[in-house]
Protein backbone atom coordinates (compact mmCIF):
# COMPACT_ATOMS: atom_id res chain seq x y z
CA UNK A 1 0.00 0.00 0.00
CA UNK A 2 1.45 3.36 -1.01
CA UNK A 3 1.89 5.98 1.67
CA UNK A 4 0.44 9.33 0.70
CA UNK A 5 2.12 12.61 1.49
CA UNK A 6 2.15 16.26 0.57
CA UNK A 7 5.34 17.64 -0.96
CA UNK A 8 6.65 21.20 -0.80
CA UNK A 9 9.82 22.13 -2.70
CA UNK A 10 12.02 25.15 -2.08
CA UNK A 11 14.79 26.09 -4.50
CA UNK A 12 17.50 28.30 -2.96
CA UNK A 13 20.67 29.96 -4.24
CA UNK A 14 23.66 28.42 -2.42
CA UNK A 15 24.35 31.61 -0.47
CA UNK A 16 24.43 32.09 3.32
CA UNK A 17 21.76 34.78 3.27
CA UNK A 18 19.16 32.23 2.09
CA UNK A 19 19.65 29.66 4.87
CA UNK A 20 17.02 31.44 6.97
CA UNK A 21 14.38 30.88 4.27
CA UNK A 22 14.74 27.13 4.66
CA UNK A 23 14.42 27.47 8.42
CA UNK A 24 11.39 29.79 8.25
CA UNK A 25 9.49 27.65 5.75
CA UNK A 26 10.20 24.56 7.84
CA UNK A 27 8.85 26.25 10.96
CA UNK A 28 5.47 26.87 9.32
CA UNK A 29 5.30 23.41 7.77
CA UNK A 30 6.20 21.62 11.03
CA UNK A 31 3.73 23.70 13.02
CA UNK A 32 0.95 22.86 10.57
CA UNK A 33 1.90 19.15 10.74
CA UNK A 34 1.42 19.13 14.53
CA UNK A 35 4.97 19.10 15.91
CA UNK A 36 5.66 20.42 19.41
CA UNK A 37 7.61 23.64 19.93
CA UNK A 38 10.69 21.67 21.04
CA UNK A 39 10.55 19.38 18.00
CA UNK A 40 10.20 22.39 15.69
CA UNK A 41 13.30 23.96 17.24
CA UNK A 42 15.24 20.70 16.71
CA UNK A 43 14.04 20.54 13.11
CA UNK A 44 15.05 24.15 12.46
CA UNK A 45 18.58 23.55 13.77
CA UNK A 46 19.02 20.33 11.77
CA UNK A 47 17.75 21.80 8.50
CA UNK A 48 19.80 24.97 8.97
CA UNK A 49 22.91 22.83 9.48
CA UNK A 50 22.18 20.76 6.36
CA UNK A 51 21.65 23.85 4.19
CA UNK A 52 24.71 25.56 5.68
CA UNK A 53 26.82 22.46 4.95
CA UNK A 54 25.73 22.62 1.31
CA UNK A 55 26.54 26.33 1.07
CA UNK A 56 29.96 25.95 2.73
CA UNK A 57 31.18 22.64 1.36
CA UNK A 58 29.42 21.81 -1.91
CA UNK A 59 30.27 25.00 -3.75
CA UNK A 60 33.11 26.54 -1.68
CA UNK A 61 32.36 29.99 -3.05
CA UNK A 62 33.79 29.07 -6.46
CA UNK A 63 30.59 28.72 -8.41
CA UNK A 64 26.96 29.64 -8.25
CA UNK A 65 25.07 26.71 -6.89
CA UNK A 66 21.56 25.72 -6.08
CA UNK A 67 20.13 23.91 -3.09
CA UNK A 68 16.82 22.06 -3.26
CA UNK A 69 14.91 21.59 0.00
CA UNK A 70 11.98 19.17 -0.17
CA UNK A 71 9.50 18.76 2.65
CA UNK A 72 7.50 15.52 2.55
CA UNK A 73 4.61 15.68 5.01
CA UNK A 74 3.20 12.31 6.09
CA UNK A 75 0.53 11.60 8.68
CA UNK A 76 3.10 10.50 11.28
CA UNK A 77 6.35 12.19 10.22
CA UNK A 78 8.11 14.90 8.29
CA UNK A 79 10.90 14.01 5.90
CA UNK A 80 13.23 16.80 4.76
CA UNK A 81 15.65 16.31 1.87
CA UNK A 82 18.39 18.90 1.33
CA UNK A 83 20.15 18.32 -2.00
CA UNK A 84 22.89 20.09 -3.89
CA UNK A 85 24.70 19.38 -7.14
CA UNK A 86 28.07 20.57 -5.86
CA UNK A 87 31.22 18.77 -4.82
CA UNK A 88 30.61 15.51 -2.99
CA UNK A 89 32.61 14.20 -0.03
CA UNK A 90 33.39 10.89 1.66
CA UNK A 91 31.74 10.81 5.08
CA UNK A 92 33.95 8.06 6.49
CA UNK A 93 37.14 9.92 5.48
CA UNK A 94 35.74 13.09 7.05
CA UNK A 95 34.97 11.25 10.31
CA UNK A 96 38.56 9.91 10.35
CA UNK A 97 39.94 13.45 9.93
CA UNK A 98 37.78 14.87 12.70
CA UNK A 99 38.15 11.97 15.10
CA UNK A 100 35.69 10.92 17.79
CA UNK A 101 34.08 13.38 20.18
CA UNK A 102 34.52 12.67 23.85
CA UNK A 103 31.51 13.04 26.13
CA UNK A 104 33.50 15.12 28.63
CA UNK A 105 35.27 17.22 25.98
CA UNK A 106 34.96 20.97 26.59
CA UNK A 107 32.75 22.48 23.89
CA UNK A 108 35.15 25.40 23.50
CA UNK A 109 37.99 22.99 22.71
CA UNK A 110 36.13 21.00 20.05
CA UNK A 111 37.44 21.20 16.53
CA UNK A 112 35.70 23.60 14.20
CA UNK A 113 33.79 21.82 11.45
CA UNK A 114 32.24 18.42 11.49
CA UNK A 115 29.60 19.31 14.06
CA UNK A 116 26.89 19.86 11.44
CA UNK A 117 26.23 16.18 10.72
CA UNK A 118 26.73 15.29 14.38
CA UNK A 119 24.01 17.79 15.34
CA UNK A 120 21.70 16.61 12.57
CA UNK A 121 22.05 12.96 13.62
CA UNK A 122 21.44 13.90 17.26
CA UNK A 123 18.33 16.01 16.63
CA UNK A 124 16.58 13.87 14.00
CA UNK A 125 15.05 10.40 14.31
CA UNK A 126 16.66 9.13 11.10
CA UNK A 127 19.32 10.55 8.77
CA UNK A 128 20.52 9.16 5.44
CA UNK A 129 23.13 10.50 3.03
CA UNK A 130 23.06 9.92 -0.71
CA UNK A 131 25.84 10.75 -3.14
CA UNK A 132 24.39 11.09 -6.62
CA UNK A 133 25.12 14.32 -8.45
CA UNK A 134 26.27 16.09 -5.30
CA UNK A 135 25.00 15.25 -1.82
CA UNK A 136 21.49 14.71 -0.48
CA UNK A 137 20.78 14.62 3.24
CA UNK A 138 17.42 13.02 4.07
CA UNK A 139 16.24 13.74 7.61
CA UNK A 140 13.16 12.23 9.24
CA UNK A 141 11.39 13.41 12.38
CA UNK A 142 8.33 11.61 13.73
CA UNK A 143 5.46 13.72 15.01
CA UNK A 144 5.31 11.91 18.34
CA UNK A 145 7.92 9.99 20.32
CA UNK A 146 5.63 6.96 20.59
CA UNK A 147 6.26 6.38 16.86
CA UNK A 148 10.03 6.38 17.45
CA UNK A 149 9.64 3.73 20.16
CA UNK A 150 7.46 1.57 17.88
CA UNK A 151 10.04 1.79 15.08
CA UNK A 152 12.86 0.92 17.49
CA UNK A 153 10.97 -2.20 18.63
CA UNK A 154 10.38 -3.37 15.07
CA UNK A 155 14.05 -2.91 14.21
CA UNK A 156 15.34 -4.84 17.22
CA UNK A 157 13.02 -7.84 16.72
Curated annotation (Swiss-Prot):
It catalyses: L-seryl-[protein] + ATP = O-phospho-L-seryl-[protein] + ADP + H(+); L-threonyl-[protein] + ATP = O-phospho-L-threonyl-[protein] + ADP + H(+). Disulfide bonds: none annotated. Its EC number is 2.7.11.1. GO terms for molecular function: ATP binding; protein serine kinase activity; protein serine/threonine kinase activity; sigma factor antagonist activity. The keyword Oxidoreductase does not apply. It comes from the Bacteria. SUPFAM superfamilies: ATPase domain of HSP90 chaperone/DNA topoisomerase II/histidine kinase. Keywords: ATP-binding, Kinase, Nucleotide-binding, Serine/threonine-protein kinase, Transferase. It is an enzyme of class 2 (transferase). Pfam families: HATPase_c_2. Gene3D superfamilies: Histidine kinase-like ATPase, C-terminal domain. CDD domains: HATPase_RsbW-like. Belongs to the anti-sigma-factor family. NCBIfam families: PRK04069.1, rsbW_low_gc. PANTHER family: ANTI-SIGMA-F FACTOR RSBW-RELATED, SERINE-PROTEIN KINASE RSBW. Negative regulator of sigma-B activity. Phosphorylates and inactivates its specific antagonist protein, RsbV. Upon phosphorylation of RsbV, RsbW is released and binds to sigma-B, thereby blocking its ability to form an RNA polymerase holoenzyme (E-sigma-B). This is Serine-protein kinase RsbW. It comes from Listeria welshimeri serovar 6b (strain ATCC 35897 / DSM 20650 / CCUG 15529 / CIP 8149 / NCTC 11857 / SLCC 5334 / V8). The gene is rsbW.
